[in-house]
Amino acid sequence: MTSSPTVNLLDLDAQGLVAYCDSLGEKPFRARQLQRWIHQYNAADFDGMTDLAKSLREKLKGRATISMPGIVSDHISTDGTRKWLIDVGNSNAVETVYIPEETRGTLCVSSQAGCAVNCRFCSTGKQGFSRNLTTGEIIGQLRMAEFALRASRGVDGGRATGGDGKGERVVTNVVMMGMGEPLLNYDAVVPAMRLMLDDNAYGLSRRRVTLSTSGVVPMMDRLGADLPVALAVSLHAPSDPLRDMLVPLNKKYPLRELMAACQRYLKVAPRDFITFEYCMLDGVNDSEAQARELLAVTRDVPCKFNLIPFNPFPESGLIRSKPEQIKRFAQVLMDAGVITTVRKTRGDDIDAACGQLAGAVKDRTRLAERTGKAAKIIEVRAV
């Protein structure tokens, strides 16, 4: 007779924990207790869960774990940005980045080891695609960062000190903008985001959790039906021929389909606009004429633009737009009444800036070298 495999409780959202407790003959309130211990009190084992019956603790010891991925490295930039390299096994690693600001703290979370989309301006895509992360590996990034940051600030709201478990929240915003395309790992990403939003876990609002996608249209519709959080779309070009080159996924879901999906999403979104991200590439997509094209393409979608100065890496063959050209491009958009920001480069001294999340990981995975070819874009069907 073989024993059942152990369950990593980090892989379970509230509904999953209720179902798991039911399988042990336990009532739903036990699931809520477990969730608080794991996500609010940072419990690493079951012995310290003092309000659980001893019999339940013994059951859990033999059947469940709270397994976090290991930390390979932890670097802090001169601007306060902090980057962790996270070991997810089999020579794969992902990166998690915390960006402190005066009124908020934003955590950039990865969803895949590598990325299959292979955008030309993104160093992560150049390492190829290895695998999807599990729900536990995704929410584990938030859990790890929140409690590491609390410890570094001397903040402890845990139960052992008489706190309510929530303490002084350090991570106030989460952006699913790290390594990978979140909508190509839908079944793991959505439960992780449910935990981010759950008041019994991290208690973030839907406006403070943003998912960034390169434009996986069927899954955008599915996300709108299941869990409409704030949405950012990696646009980067005002025409299909150029976007086909910069974002290969565009060949499957061209701009017309993408804009229609954005309109549908806005009907259920927690914000009344879509954020369009646009990487500024010298002589490629940064002319004033292209800014006007961009306005025409997005005219039916309430939006704001986030212009991102390109962070160069050797394999790209691309150059960052000059600051004065970025300013001229932005002015065209603003003159049309569209809110436009230019992203401030953060953490570039530790390779934590936008598009740089491959650095040390690329050397660890060497995926392109092992496969000898770029990963193919995953076929996606809405279910």
UniProtKB/Swiss-Prot annotation:
One GO BP annotation of this record: tRNA methylation
Cofactor: [4Fe-4S] cluster
CDD domains noted in UniProt: Radical_SAM
Location (main, coarse): cytoplasm
EC top class, as a word: transferase
Domain of life the protein comes from: Bacteria
Database matches in InterPro entries: Aldolase_TIM, Methyltransferase_A, RlmN_N, RNA_MTrfase_RlmN, rRNA_lsu_MTrfase_RlmN/Cfr, rSAM
Keyword annotations: 4Fe-4S, Cytoplasm, Disulfide bond, Iron, Iron-sulfur, Metal-binding, Methyltransferase, rRNA processing, S-adenosyl-L-methionine, Transferase, tRNA processing
Protein's job: Specifically methylates position 2 of adenine 2503 in 23S rRNA and position 2 of adenine 37 in tRNAs. m2A2503 modification seems to play a crucial role in the proofreading step occurring at the peptidyl transferase center and thus would serve to optimize ribosomal fidelity.
PANTHER family referenced in this protein's UniProt entry, alphabetically: 23S RRNA METHYLTRANSFERASE, RADICAL SAM CORE DOMAIN-CONTAINING PROTEIN
Further facts: Reaction proceeds by a ping-pong mechanism involving intermediate methylation of a conserved cysteine residue.
Name of the protein: Dual-specificity RNA methyltransferase RlmN
Origin species: Paraburkholderia xenovorans (strain LB400)
